[in-house]
Amino acid sequence: MKRLFIYIMLLMGVILPSAAKNRAKQVIAHRGYWKTEGSAQNSISSLQNTYKIGVYGSEFDVHITRDGEVVVFHDDDVEGIKIENANYADIKDKRLKNGERIPKLQEYLAAAKLLGNMKLILEVKEHIQKSDEDRCIDATLKMVNEAGLADRTEYISFSKHACDYIVQHAPKSKVSYLNGDLSPREAKEAGYAGIDYEDSVYIDHPSWIKEARQLGLVTNVWTVNDLKEIKYFFRQGIDYVTTNEPEKAKAL
């Protein structure tokens, strides 16, 4: 239904015109550029692949183990082992689909340091215990700062608690909220730098991109893989598109 709406908008000619832009600077690779031979989601190779195609940034996810190791992984469990309740030793030998080990955040950041000025879009995953989110953020901020990557790292989360905690403890950091239940004004009042919402949220609230821009917020949309839909959001003035097709999006 949402794509039908977009196609109708295109046919009616009501899409807002936009000036020509360098699309590469507007594209974020979702969990890295993993749709290539020999790579996998949230792997170090997917991070390196993102750099090779020259887009704005590489998105990835972090959790913290019971014994304090921050790992880069999307799901909250690894082969049925709940990351939040496990020690790192319980998952350290598990492999991604391409055979790589699940990266520690420290390893991921070390690889990122070698990749020019590409942005790191770091998602703090929701944890069952908010105290574990706090532990995850504290450890993450420490590692990012020690790696000298604070100016290249932007933070996102579905957890309002996590976003608020980052704003409080790293007020110079760019934080965008993912959950889609705050208006641009509410996000601004919370101290966030932007809104990073699913495509359907912007379809349901067509004025939010413009409102966010007027408030000085950045806007991102996820996870959009249909090229017509990506083009629609570019024409609407979205700042960034998070996609599993970063190389194709860059070429639009």
Annotated model-derived regions:
Residues 16-252:
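Phosphate-group recognition and catalysis centered on beta-loop-alpha active-site segments
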Residues 1-24:
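Bacterial Sec-dependent N-terminal signal peptides
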